[in-house]
């Protein structure tokens, strides 16, 4: 079942490419009204501030780069970015949006991707929660191999909060790692979605040879900054 759901995730983000940013910018089905939207953006500002505490680096690897929401932030930190995603549609949006010679785009399924070099900083946002538990260790080991000795990692993901998703989605606080997601046109896809607690994420990062500080915002986000332990 895991392989089928992973393929569904890829198809989901392919079909969602042109509406993905509605979630981030709280428009359309994700508009929760002035108060909740402002809460979302205030908490995003906290995460962005933490990201920009990182000193400038030469080369960044961004995994699951998506439509460029965070790639544009990373351009302020890195001299060069390698941006990887499994979905050509989001890579195209990212590329057209940024039009930066500093970004090298590559299309890879992150479950078959293998690092061929090391980077100063590895970044991924809203991706780890889509990694099935059976694939988590191998993925994080590959991340570790892609970070140079003493290099850095920054991760952003979702907390369990019902108002984070579309108004016609219902987040269930149960033990299932699977969720059904719906697009604007009514198409439905099954995906993996796991909400980590800070201690859980910290333990996984320690196992992958990172010493990290994991933090949460009040409602919406969990994020981690760490360095590779040699």
Name each model-derived stretch.
Residues 126-127:
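Short catalytic micro-motifs in class I SAM-dependent methyltransferases
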